[in-house]
Amino acid sequence: MNQQKSTFIFILTLGILSMLPPFGVDMYLPSFLEIAKDLDVSPEQVQHTLTSFAYGMAFGQLFWGPFGDSFGRKPIILLGVIVGALTALVLTEINSVGNFTALRFVQGFFGAAPVVLSGALLRDLFSKDQLSKVMSTITLVFMLAPLVAPIIGGYIVKFFHWHAIFYVISLVGLLAAALVFFIIPETHKKENRIPLRLNIIARNFLLLWKQKEVLGYMFAASFSFGGLFAFVTAGSIVYIGIYGVPVDQFGYFFMMNIVTMIFASFLNSRFVTKVGAETMLRIALAIQFLSGMWLILTALLDLGFWPMAIGVAFFVGPNPVISSNAMASALERCPQMAGTANSLIGSVRFAVGAIMGSLVASMKMDTAAPMLFTMGACVVISVLAYYFLTSRNLKSRG
């Protein structure tokens, strides 16, 4: 019983760690207009603070993986969580959007450490079958963050100052750091640690870039995520600023998208062993493609809020299915470099998301069209990358 209890607390701690990035992103979405007013800038400039966080996550995923292999998992995870929490506190004292954007990059960069190294820590401890079960549990905990964070953020903005959002983010981060310190063991033994050799790291990344199929899956997942991040970047301005959704109600509309993601993930877990990752990936891409075309149509015909909101939910829903199955298919083709591939794909995924978010943020948001066209374009690129870069062996993989 004690062993079961300690395992539960261990998994719960990792689940809380996995919640930190979505808390850092989703909780302050309802506050964009308030931040813009407070800093005397346009809402579009505030959007760049979100894409800056994503750029930090992209670079951090390349950086922290090798450091964790060299210096151990626990100290790097602690460093990332503590710096992220302290950065959230500093953000409450910032009165310049430029400094705010720079600090969000720092927060994303250090926030990547627990994301990358939690997975490595799990691989140190669990067998393949156990790992799958543990990851399913952690995913359920992770899904709570984007489900509740925008709702919490909306009520905080309604009743308090937007600074309070970052106090909460900092408090959650410090709580996570305490849990890591007292509960998480160091799993990467000193005799297994790998010295930092940049030439070997660079060589492995280059080898992956030369594998056509790996690129196909990577870009399929990355541009699917890019479409999602275009919505995350601009969604609050579109819903609140353009369609007049009350700030404290935005989280409930955002929740609709998370529910479709959870439902899609559930269906994937039920059927992927029966029909295969490749089939589930194709189905998810097809649903997202049709949803993307519908969103473009709603923009062209100005169909209003609900047709757009429902289309967004169906667009966002397949994203975890695309991501998980594309990742599994890519790693299957480079098992000897699975860690490097995981780091590279995660980095490219956030980089594409940041670029798409920056693209949307650079456009004038008088209507929802810039966001919707960007989402539609992303899924087109995703489908084309999958079709042209992985098509040679589709028949043999069935």
UniProtKB/Swiss-Prot annotation:
The portions of this protein that span the membrane are 8-28, 52-72, 75-95, 102-122, 137-157, 164-184, 225-245, 247-267, 275-295, 296-316, 343-363, 369-389
Keyword Coiled coil in record? no
Report the superkingdom from the record.
Bacteria
Q: Where in the cell is it found?
A: Cell inner membrane
SUPFAM superfamilies tied to this protein? MFS general substrate transporter
The residue stretches assigned to a coiled coil in this entry are: none
Q: Which UniProt keywords apply?
A: Antibiotic resistance, Cell inner membrane, Cell membrane, Membrane, Transmembrane, Transmembrane helix, Transport
What topology in the membrane does the UniProt record assign? Multi-pass membrane protein
Q: Please, one GO biological process term? A: xenobiotic detoxification by transmembrane export across the plasma membrane
Pfam families linked: MFS_1
- Specify whether Manganese is a keyword of the entry: no
- GO CC, alphabetical: plasma membrane
Q: What are the GO MF terms of this UniProt record?
A: sodium:proton antiporter activity; xenobiotic transmembrane transporter activity
Q: Which family does it belong to?
A: Belongs to the major facilitator superfamily. Bcr/CmlA family.
Free-text function comment from the UniProt entry: Involved in sulfonamide (sulfathiazole) and bicyclomycin resistance. Probable membrane translocase.
State what protein this is by name.
Bicyclomycin resistance protein homolog
Give the originating organism. Answer: Haemophilus influenzae (strain ATCC 51907 / DSM 11121 / KW20 / Rd)
Lineage of the native species?
Bacteria, Pseudomonadati, Pseudomonadota, Gammaproteobacteria, Pasteurellales
